[in-house]
Amino acid sequence: MDLHVWLAFVAASLALLVIPGPTLLLVVSYALTQGRRVAVAMAAGVALGDFLAMSASLLGLGALVATSATLFTLLKWIGAVYLVWMGIGLWRSAGKAGLQGLSRPADLPAGQVFRHAALVTALNPKSIAFFVAFVPQFIAPGAPLGPQFTVMIATFVSMAALNALLFALLANRMRRFLTTPHSAAWVTRLGGAALVGMGLMTATLRRA
């Protein structure tokens, strides 16, 4: 892949990654309530989710999602239900403790955060279909596809993980304002409500 093409891909990927969506919302919610203890787990989960979604797109699943109403609807509802389920769980946990209680590893293991981040990122039919339209713009038709796909996947996944980590650390710095159980519970409920709202929005997605 030529350097100027790769730089264009990096710029386009950056613009895509900073757009708020289910993944960034989840990252910020967990960072505010769990702290930077789970930041690496979130970044790793986002990386895995994007790797699966992008790889599936390049292997043809994205084209199938874009043309199959049934598969698109199935993935849409799985993602929507999962987001609502997590939002309700986050809301219900708000009354249990303030930040000291929320930050205990036993309350929410890093492995669970990793799985949540990976699933929310991967189970987004719009992302899978988007990669189908996004990636071909940077492919050189006369060159072998394998090396180009490898470079683009490695680049995008690395940027996605770094983006999630930075958002998590920035959100973690805001935790100093959450010094009382009341404020911590308020932010937790807000995050839960936002996840439920994002799940409901996901349920209304239509194929482009």
Labelled PLM ranges:
Residues T67-G98, V157-L170, R175-A208:
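Selective transmembrane alpha-helices of multi-pass membrane proteins
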Residues L123-V132, G192-L195:
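Core segments of transmembrane alpha-helices
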Residues G21, G35, N124-P125, T180:
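Short loop-to-helix capping motifs
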Residues S13-L17, T121, P125, V157-L165:
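Residue-level hotspots within the lipid-embedded alpha helices of multi-pass solute transporters
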Residues W91-V120, F177:
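Cytosolic-biased juxtamembrane loops and peripheral soluble domains of multi-pass membrane proteins
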Residues V10-A11, L25, V113-H116, K126, ...:
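Short hydrophobic "helix-edge" motifs at membrane interfaces and signal-peptide entry regions
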Residues V40-V46, Y82, G111-L123:
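Alpha-helical transmembrane segments of integral membrane proteins, especially early/N-terminal helices
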Residues D2-T73, A133-M152, F156, A168:
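Juxtamembrane transmembrane-helix termini in multi-pass membrane transport proteins
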